[in-house]
Amino acid sequence: FFPIGVFCKIFKTC
């Protein structure tokens, strides 16, 4: 799965 940082950038949900 994607790292939390990448997930943040793509889905804009931190």
Curated annotation (Swiss-Prot):
Keywords: Amphibian defense peptide, Antibiotic, Antimicrobial, Disulfide bond, Secreted. The keyword Thylakoid does not apply. GO terms for biological process: antibiotic metabolic process; defense response to Gram-negative bacterium; defense response to Gram-positive bacterium. Expressed by the skin dorsal glands. It is found in: Secreted. GO terms for cellular component: extracellular region. Transmembrane segments: none annotated. Its main location: secreted. Disulfide bonds join 8-14. Antibacterial activity against the Gram-negative bacterium E.coli and the Gram-positive bacterium S.aureus. This is Japonicin-1. It comes from Rana japonica. The lineage of its organism: Eukaryota, Metazoa, Chordata, Craniata, Vertebrata.
